[in-house]
Amino acid sequence: MPEAKLNNNVNDVTSYSSASSSTENAADLHNYNGFDEHTEARIQKLARTLTAQSMQNSTQSAPNKSDAQSIFSSGVEGVNPIFSDPEAPGYDPKLDPNSENFSSAAWVKNMAHLSAADPDFYKPYSLGCAWKNLSASGASADVAYQSTVVNIPYKILKSGLRKFQRSKETNTFQILKPMDGCLNPGELLVVLGRPGSGCTTLLKSISSNTHGFDLGADTKISYSGYSGDDIKKHFRGEVVYNAEADVHLPHLTVFETLVTVARLKTPQNRIKGVDRESYANHLAEVAMATYGLSHTRNTKVGNDIVRGVSGGERKRVSIAEVSICGSKFQCWDNATRGLDSATALEFIRALKTQADISNTSATVAIYQCSQDAYDLFNKVCVLDDGYQIYYGPADKAKKYFEDMGYVCPSRQTTADFLTSVTSPSERTLNKDMLKKGIHIPQTPKEMNDYWVKSPNYKELMKEVDQRLLNDDEASREAIKEAHIAKQSKRARPSSPYTVSYMMQVKYLLIRNMWRLRNNIGFTLFMILGNCSMALILGSMFFKIMKKGDTSTFYFRGSAMFFAILFNAFSSLLEIFSLYEARPITEKHRTYSLYHPSADAFASVLSEIPSKLIIAVCFNIIFYFLVDFRRNGGVFFFYLLINIVAVFSMSHLFRCVGSLTKTLSEAMVPASMLLLALSMYTGFAIPKKKILRWSKWIWYINPLAYLFESLLINEFHGIKFPCAEYVPRGPAYANISSTESVCTVVGAVPGQDYVLGDDFIRGTYQYYHKDKWRGFGIGMAYVVFFFFVYLFLCEYNEGAKQKGEILVFPRSIVKRMKKRGVLTEKNANDPENVGERSDLSSDRKMLQESSEEESDTYGEIGLSKSEAIFHWRNLCYEVQIKAETRRILNNVDGWVKPGTLTALMGASGAGKTTLLDCLAERVTMGVITGDILVNGIPRDKSFPRSIGYCQQQDLHLKTATVRESLRFSAYLRQPAEVSIEEKNRYVEEVIKILEMEKYADAVVGVAGEGLNVEQRKRLTIGVELTAKPKLLVFLDEPTSGLDSQTAWSICQLMKKLANHGQAILCTIHQPSAILMQEFDRLLFMQRGGKTVYFGDLGEGCKTMIDYFESHGAHKCPADANPAEWMLEVVGAAPGSHANQDYYEVWRNSEEYRAVQSELDWMERELPKKGSITAAEDKHEFSQSIIYQTKLVSIRLFQQYWRSPDYLWSKFILTIFNQLFIGFTFFKAGTSLQGLQNQMLAVFMFTVIFNPILQQYLPSFVQQRDLYEARERPSRTFSWISFIFAQIFVEVPWNILAGTIAYFIYYYPIGFYSNASAAGQLHERGALFWLFSCAFYVYVGSMGLLVISFNQVAESAANLASLLFTMSLSFCGVMTTPSAMPRFWIFMYRVSPLTYFIQALLAVGVANVDVKCADYELLEFTPPSGMTCGQYMEPYLQLAKTGYLTDENATDTCSFCQISTTNDYLANVNSFYSERWRNYGIFICYIAFNYIAGVFFYWLARVPKKNGKLSKK
């Protein structure tokens, strides 16, 4: 990577640098005829010198200004670096980012020269920061107990009450105690401290990013005279906080990501003659060249799912983003994580160059800081548990703590020493001072008191006061003028953004179009999917409309209902994409790139084309397949209305997504809206039949007006021939037209047709005059929801973060409160709940003698290794496309009991691959060589005879530490060992790992649970409780940890080795002190080749001697042996080996000694026999039944402790079914009542998708943990895993079904039907069985679709498709008799066919029908006949229907159906088939579960005859 001179320089300087490219240009601009050219040049030079001096005076408080001063006083003018032609005169390849000779340092200096040449145009300025009495507090968790299904309502109620109560005792805890500091322009500050000490909070505080916590009332922060509120409102982009996480839009390329930022930050006062586009492109190219990203220009950034650049490159993209922003005050939170030490050093050097040349300030929090990097900082701040224990010059910090009473060991970096004083287990006290009785501060409070009384503190306060005094009106005005000069013409001067609102929309629109182009497959899939659904749904009604008579009325309404719903809810999944992009939008808002509403505006605009294409494709296919009216005007109005439906609902769902803070929060109201909007469209319940209490829903429902317009459009002005008359038959062949009537609403006696307008007026109360009203109201909703969406995006803040706390089960909290250990006030105090286990003063120091350790461990009785694990000529090859690549190349080695062996090498050397091969964890490729235990090949029990600690700390978040350890012990230790003995062993492991303080704490998630170190200890503990008989593998146990935690973990491994455990551990570039903890080293270079295997020796002398004796340069006394070794073999960035050390190793005496030792092992060790008893060679230590029992108990416990999952299920169930129940309240047995009851049964099933979508992430979470950790270690079988999922999910679904039954069955009035039929108990019980069966069916379908799918979203889409198909062909929306013959098989295989038929029959069968007055058919009987006499032949033929008055002679009122069984027969529902249908539905559930188990085995379970082969 180049010297990396930040693009912050780029924008610092370039933000206002945009001027003349040459002296000649300046001369032309300022030509004055009264002087000759020589005199003019002298005057210009004098003016620049005076201006430069003025600027220097304004920043005189900054100490290191040599580079900046030399630039301003040199008189050298910069040149325009933006070249179109390398052959142009004055071309300098050092300034061309596309040149191999590009120098970012030269580029930054050139831009500084340009700025100095015309300060009136570029408005140079600086920004410092001073803070006084800075303190911060966060909301405490009450709250420090775990939520469960039972206590969550109480917690929510209590939390709500507290918002309305004004109590003296606030529910907060202090994160930062009062502290002070000052950072002048041009200075670099490093913040050091262990995780949880408050480093991140300090950076957020001084960068005015305080969302989630509050600053103290006495806190004073000044940014060159501006307050934090001023910065947030007007100068947000000048103070930037770069978070540790790397979040980017994955489908954008690196160049597209950076050029978008550059466009949004291109200043108005840029280089003269350079347009915005050229300037932005140049900045992006400079950023890529500076950070070694040029080769990734057209590569997607990617993420964990989308393939893109590497993790390290993604981190550099994050750095480049901030660099382009050009802020004057930057805060970097662990920005070097994921970078190797050399790249991290170059990054710090870039910040230093930027500070020196451009007068910027930077604050950097680093966990592992090398000495070279530390020496670049001007100041250092050391934090411990929220206390400031030092702030001042970096070169004086070491002496300060040595004077306090601490000793810095040899070869320990200054940064490590400064943080080590905060760790009782690592720091070394000055024994001479102790002997003299001098008190050495040891607790954070004592160190803070010592600091406040020190002369260093007084010097700091002088500097702070001076800085605050210098922050006058002049400095504020300079910042303001510079900011305004950078802004585009139409940008508000008070706005913190560089470009105007519409320019932001423009650039974001371009970015979004790039996103769509780069992920065009998704758009094409959506188009294809919608076209497919149009073909399927449209073909359901194929040829039905050909008749064109009154028999098509219901189907026309049904098809229109399908159309409006499908168009409207096609945007429901947009909520997912909103939450995918939200973290990026929030990050860019803090960078002051654009308004969140501008991003929302652009996202709406960018999706218009795809939405239109999808809508047009779907509606054209659907319209003409259904055979709606063939009229151009009618068709285009239909299309217009459905497009309005698409956009109105899209904006509505976007509002829901922007109003909520998490995806799970958004899905609940979205699901509720889906139900309410669809039910009150006007088809399920006509407007006139809606109950009074809920009619308001129809009036505010945009879909109701749009559906009204669609029906009016379809039915207006058409005469539909009558398809069926009453009465009819041979006896009525010669009757007059007035003596019969058409059987549909709107029919007029004597007419052989029905006007469409009459039908919709009588059925729906729709009138043609309201046709365009729906369009107008729909458009009004589109506009209204659009602006609401923009407003919510602009002002809705994300979810607040919580301070890092431990969470305990409520029973533990009660116990602690009884003992007085915990109160609400100190519930979140780390020292009370053990957040920092090493802070207790009585903790046993780790520097005990080995003899004492041996005695202690002898009492503990940890498992000891008894066998030697060794391997020889180990090779591993994989097939990558057409190439066979060798990952491991003839690797030899062994691990003996009682030794700690390090496995080292550069990235790509094959360290983790070697561990996976040795541990039998690879699933593909070819392994050759010998892997032996005491000279004998591994058996089936080998995977559970070892411990394997993965780099990722994977644990069940709802379990406590003790429960996690016991679960491992119960399932992995031999079955013969009693539960009591296993429990005792777990307690012993807790003791040796020093986890007593948080043994009952919940694992939780980051910020609310165990911290990084505690999780790593738990990972090791889980493997130790299994009592590994052979050895323990650890993969990068120190990755991502601070140096003190890394040292603590290494000390723990040393303990275990001293007790007789064999340990093989990969480690990435350890410090000199960490290196000394290992006994042996296996060092590999790229290609999986061994370059050293042997003892390290005292101070790594044996290893150093080996390399020095084979041509390596001498290792300096103060060097880190690990870094020196990497440099020697050419594994460090920028280093080159002087020879092939693999060949050196293969020809060395040490190699021959290794081979000799392996020969002896293979010859002698087998004589000892196998260490595994014959009966203990099974794959698992416990039976399948016992495994399933324990896994089920754990899963049930997880559900109980996951109230968000269960309560979401119950709340959705309660709302949906209660809403349906009271919408169809007491539906009755009129024709419309029966129709309502059928639709109520139909709507009962729409909860399918919301319930299923909640289940899938829960399953994926369980599966990921099992497949990543528990399956490879043979903790339990996949059979136990999958059956536990079934056993635990079913009871909760039955409970949800029971809740649904009570709040759905009784309000609708099904019980009244059963009572009238004299079958109250039987039908009530049967309805309950069906209700429970449906919820179990949802769970079974969830298991089926996720069993072979990797991603929950893909499984949800598949399930939604299957459900839509099943629901569409169940016989409700179109009857089987009307369905095309091709689709009859779908009707028969749909599980919902049998469910709805049975549920409808159980709900409404065996009851008399009573028609409403408007449902009666009226006609005149022949003269001299009563209605009864006239209708008698028809009633004998039809066998259904009744007359209201058989003796009437003037007008006959006839109801077409007499019993509910007649109505049920029309939809193929028969009460006699209720149990048959129930049995069939249960068979579908069983099939889903069996298929789910099979597909899981087929797709997810490794097979013995799979892709892995051994030779």
From Swiss-Prot:
FK506, isonitrile, enniatin, RU49953, kitasatospora E420, staurosporine CGP42700, prenyl-flavonoids, D-octapeptides were found to be inhibitors in vivo. Vanadate and oligomycin were found to be inhibitors in vitro. Strains lacking PDR5 are used for toxicity tests. Strains overexpressing PDR5 are used for screening antifungal sensitizers. Residues 543-558, 629-631, 686-774, 1261-1291, 1350-1354, 1408-1476 are extracellular. Changing G1009C: Confers generalized drug resistance. InterPro entries: AAA+_ATPase (IPR003593), ABC2_TM (IPR013525), ABC_trans_N (IPR029481), ABC_transporter-like_ATP-bd (IPR003439), ABC_transporter-like_CS (IPR017871), ABCG_PDR_1 (IPR034001), ABCG_PDR_2 (IPR034003), Drug-R_PDR/CDR (IPR005285). Active efflux of weakly charged organic compounds of 90 cubic Angstroms to 300 cubic Angstroms surface volume. Confers resistance to numerous chemicals including cycloheximide, sulfomethuron methyl, steroids, antiseptics, antibiotics, anticancer, herbicides, mycotoxins, insecticides, ionophores, alkaloids, flavonoids, phenothiazines, organotin compounds, carbazoles, lysosomotropic aminoesters, detergents, rhodamines and other fluorophores, azoles and other antifungals. Exhibits nucleoside triphosphatase activity. Present with 42000 molecules/cell in log phase SD medium in log phase SD medium. This is Pleiotropic ABC efflux transporter of multiple drugs. The gene is PDR5.
